[in-house]
């Protein structure tokens, strides 16, 4: 069987046609998988052969149909910054969207759902409520101290509203425009990590964006904890602080070093 790979308008991709993704200087592309230990989805194997049939088609031959159709989460490096409102997309369920565009509505929808204990923030004894809303609050405070979040759906307008507050200041909840980009950039990462299905793949680009070094280390720690809880986390990063956060999480929590893979390009 042959299956078409969509190169554009999926997961934020705009790759053009197959001519644009061919390796220059190579007449033949051969993809081989040797001693594969990283599983993408449980109970699925994916031996693949790439066949370039012409400059406009890319085909996959093998057992890869629907490989990313379920239990796959992806956050682009160019996530949405501060917004007062986000449109409610009724077609999207349990996904923040490629750019985090569904984050506010999703958070409001799942706020009372329970979080698996392995993913709960437990570094401080008084932060033990295991709902998604509270766990988002705890982890956000760990990465960007003092931030409180309020969300609401305005259903007749089909929009979701978010307001933010700095707990140390007596200002009340304000527009996200009054705060830095780091909050809006990291919130979909936290929410996705907490709701991702066990065994699913979570791919996130540049989780360090708009965070100071300590925050970068802490988001690395968070993602490592989500991996230890059963989510397969794939990170693209330029930050040594993110990597150090992963190392700290592994050291403190007895993570098997063989479960961590760092590739330098």
What are these regions (language model features)?
Residues 2-188, 192, 197-198:
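Phosphate-coordinating catalytic segments in nucleotide- and nucleic-acid-processing enzymes
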